């Protein structure tokens, strides 16, 4: 049925696309996405606080490499929220589109492999972002 025929039939046009599990693409719904975004916020606040503390106490610039941890946590949270994909769930072979807590198992082996690969990419990207920001912080003249 074409879009014109669908509209002419008097049925309302669809306004949103349902989000569902897609191997290696999407494994979390709105509640889990919000949780990942909050983790990103917490990591960002911790990163700024740690940098401020290290500068305030006059710690040697090399100590700013500690920023890799909270920055990686922040990057991981934001990446997972943006991508609608939980790295931890992907590594465990589970997904959740409902309320926080209950999860469902991924049954297909090929789907699990795609999820694990995506999880690894998110983890590596998060660490890379953390390392890059930490190195820049070490080089800051403050």
Regions found by a protein language model. Name each.
Residues 2-142:
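Membrane-interfacial helix-loop segments of redox and metal-homeostasis proteins
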């Amino acid at each position: 049925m074409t879009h014109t025929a669908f509209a002419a039939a008097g049925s309302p046009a669809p306004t949103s696309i349902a989000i569902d599990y897609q191997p290696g693409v999407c494994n979390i719904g709105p509640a889990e996405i919000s949780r990942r975004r909050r983790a990103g916020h917490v990591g960002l606040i911790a990163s700024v606080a740690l940098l401020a503390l290290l500068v305030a106490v006059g710690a040697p610039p090399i100590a700013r490499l500690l920023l890799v941890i909270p920055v990686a946590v922040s990057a991981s949270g934001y990446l997972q929220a943006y991508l609608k994909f939980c790295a931890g769930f992907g590594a465990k072979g589970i997904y959740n589109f409902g309320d926080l807590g209950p999860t469902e198992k991924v049954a297909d082996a090929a789907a699990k492999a795609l999820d694990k690969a995506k999880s690894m990419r998110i983890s590596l990207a998060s660490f890379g972002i953390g390392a890059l920001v930490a190195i820049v912080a070490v080089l800051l003249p403050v």
